Regions:
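Amphipathic alpha-helical assembly/interaction segments
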Residues: 1-126
Length: 126
């Protein structure tokens, strides 16, 4: 049986594997939160679509980084994930300003995405 519940595996011999697994878990949790948010959006469908796609890109790029053997390519994947997470944060801000979603519903997702941006910035600089 696997030691983790993911189809994506992070090299256990890597000293940063635990952090990378943690950021992947955060990305999946964020994706779940986004799914809940987008289900409630009844207007501004372009923002709904952008938020959903960008949240998906975050998790996908972290997963792609897990499969890379090149340090430079891993960093690039983390940078792309960070940019997508930053896009998500901006869309959440726009939705809040335009009253597209209740602020209380956005707050947990925004907090999680900001933590993701920070972690991904750190991972992309290694």
């Amino acid at each position: 049986m696997d030691s983790h519940p993911f189809a994506v595996s992070f090299r256990e011999d890597n000293p940063h594997a635990k952090q990378r697994t943690g950021v992947y878990e955060q990305a999946l949790a964020f994706s779940e939160q986004v799914d809940t948010i987008v289900e409630t959006i009844t207007a501004r469908f372009h923002l709904k679509d952008l938020l959903d796609k960008s949240a998906t890109v975050v998790a996908l790029r972290i997963a792609q980084a897990a499969g890379e053997t090149s340090k430079a390519e891993r960093r690039r994947q983390y940078r792309v994930a960070r940019r997508a997470a930053t896009d998500c944060a901006a869309v959440l801000d726009i939705l809040a300003r335009r009253k597209g979603v209740e602020p209380g519903q956005i707050a947990p997702a925004r907090q999680l995405v900001m933590a993701l941006v920070s972690e991904l910035a750190h991972l992309s600089s290694r």
